[in-house]
Each structure stands twice: as structure tokens, then as C-alpha cells.
Amino acid sequence: MIRIAIDCMGGDFGLPVTIPAAIEFARQFPDTRLLLVGLPDAIEAALAERRDAPRDRLDIVPATEVVSMDDPVEVALRRKKDSSMRLAAQAVKDGRADACISAGNTGAWMAISRYVLKTLDGIDRPAIATSIPNQTGRATTVLDLGANVDCSAEHLLQFAIMGAALSQAVDHRDRPTVGLLNIGEEIIKGNEVVKEAAELLRASPLNFYGNVEGNDIFKGTVDVVVCDGFVGNVVLKSVEGLAKMLSSVIREEFKRNFITLLAGAFAKPVLNRLRNRVDNRRYNGAALLGLRGVVIKSHGSADAYAFGFALQRAREAVASKLLERTAQTVAQITKRVQSGEAVAPGAAGDTA
């Protein structure tokens, strides 16, 4: 039985999203038990509205406080010690849950998770990773997405190790290729941190492809793309904005006149398939890698459909033993790097 603790109060919408998503998820996956963490009376009232809720696998964990989306990290971490967010992470720490998930304040969730669970040996900073759909029909894992604005070359190497472990565990890639996001493929491109990180990656046992550019994320050139949190967050928000704009433009164009409406009717099956491939809700659920527990961050504005996919990400991470694989991969590669062992980098993106 896979146990997932949910911060039911987090996000822009809270219970109207988390409870319906939890119920549908529990019905879809009978091998899961959900810990619903939050204000008990409010959760009980929300569950009472759904007669189809599998109550035998939905456990309410009472909390007396809620971390709001605009709470400073210090307030969430030091003052709200009985918050639904804090208790969800604590459930993993205590062994009562295998994973935890929140749609709440990203900075607070990262700080609380790191404080409660601590980082893995060999990891200085956790990183946020998610999947972005590409033209191959699969997805590219990208990290960091905002947890670490300023990074050293060593941090980028650690992100690459964790990203490769995530790709192996969840996406079932035997030896995932890793690319370093840069302004060009040439080894002379980039700032000093990126250049130094590239040298560390070339000397590591990872399957390092070389430098990649932003368009390579969507081409599926590599399995994992590594960058600092500042760049990664800009990439993520740009992708989300572009997807919404394209969807809006396509809708407007097909509604322009009778002919375009007719064309839209014929094109509807194709458009539906396209929508499913690029719908960012289907890729909701970023993993906070490098912690001693499986921690998932849902988008704050997620609806119940999107939050359900974040729950699926948590379930997949536990089922694929992501935590154990990440710890093992970090230990193995750290040992090999310290011993001076290296492999030849992939030359495709490693041009002069």
C-alpha cells in the first residue's frame, strides 16, 4: 500500500481542488492510502459532499494552521509549526507516509521539506524538477526550476546526478543523456559557472551530451536538461505562457467565420490529440529532489484534474523507488568522481 500525505489546504483554491482530486485518485488506484492533512472540520465537510469517497483509505490528519501563498518563509517555518504543510512533511519523516504533496507556497514548501527531511548525503541543495513534453512524444526532465537562483558548478553537477536518477526511475531510461542549458552548443559559450559545470560533467560518469539550447528541450535532444533555478523558472513560466497563448489563438482562428468553424469541426480529433500532448496540467507535479523523502510540488493554480496528475507523480516516484535510486546514484557517482574515474562525454553537443 502506497501512502501519500496531502497538504489539503495549500494552493490558490485549497479544499475545492485537493479533496475532489484525492477522491478520484483513491478510486483509480486502490493500492493507495491518502493522509488528508488540514483543518479537520473543513475536510470532513468536503468529504461529506461526496458519497463515492472511499473513506476506508482516506485518513484525516488534523492541523490547526495553514500556510498562505503570501506567507514569508520565516513565518511558515518558525511560527506555523502545526500547519498542514508542516505535518504533511512530518508524516514522511515519521514513516507514516511514503510521499507528501502540496500546491502551496513554493518557498515555504521547500524550506519546510528541507528542514524536516534533510538532504541526502552528497547533496548540498535540493532542486525542483519536472517534465516538459517534447516532439518525440515523450518528455524532457528539466531542473532546477526555481529552488536555487544562484548556483555553483558543483551544484549543477549535483542537479545533473539527481535528474539522471529521476529519469531512470520514473521515465525508465537506462542511461539518460544529460545536457547543460547554455546560449550555444560550443564549449566556449556561457558564463564561468556554466563553463566550469561543463568541465565537471565531462569528467563525471554521467552520459553527458554537452551544451544544449532552449529549443533542445522541445526537440527531445537529451533526456535531462540542467540549469540554475533562475533560468529554469523563466523557462517554465515561458512554456506555460506559450501553451496558453497558442490554445487561445487556435480557438479564436477557428471561430473567425463559418468556413473556419467547419474546418474546426473536421479538425477536432486532431486538435484534441494536440491539446492532450501539450496540456501542461498532464505534467503537473514537480519533484523536490535531494531530500530524504519523496516530496512533490503541485502548481498553485492547479485544478482538480491537474492535481490528480501530481498525485500520480508521487505514486510513480514511490513505486519506482525514486528515493532509493537517487541516494544510490548519488553515492556511486560521488565515489567515482572522488576516485578520478571518468567516461568520455557525448560529443554531439560538445563542439568547439
UniProtKB/Swiss-Prot annotation:
Catalytic activity from the UniProt record: a fatty acyl-[ACP] + phosphate = an acyl phosphate + holo-[ACP]
A Pfam family the protein falls into: FA_synthesis
Keyword terms, alphabetized: Cytoplasm, Lipid biosynthesis, Lipid metabolism, Phospholipid biosynthesis, Phospholipid metabolism, Transferase
SUPFAM superfamilies in alphabetical order: Isocitrate/Isopropylmalate dehydrogenase-like (SSF53659)
Its biological purpose: Catalyzes the reversible formation of acyl-phosphate (acyl-PO(4)) from acyl-[acyl-carrier-protein] (acyl-ACP). This enzyme utilizes acyl-ACP as fatty acyl donor, but not acyl-CoA.
Assembly and oligomerization: Homodimer. Probably interacts with PlsY.
Protein name (database record): Phosphate acyltransferase
Organism: Bordetella pertussis (strain Tohama I / ATCC BAA-589 / NCTC 13251)
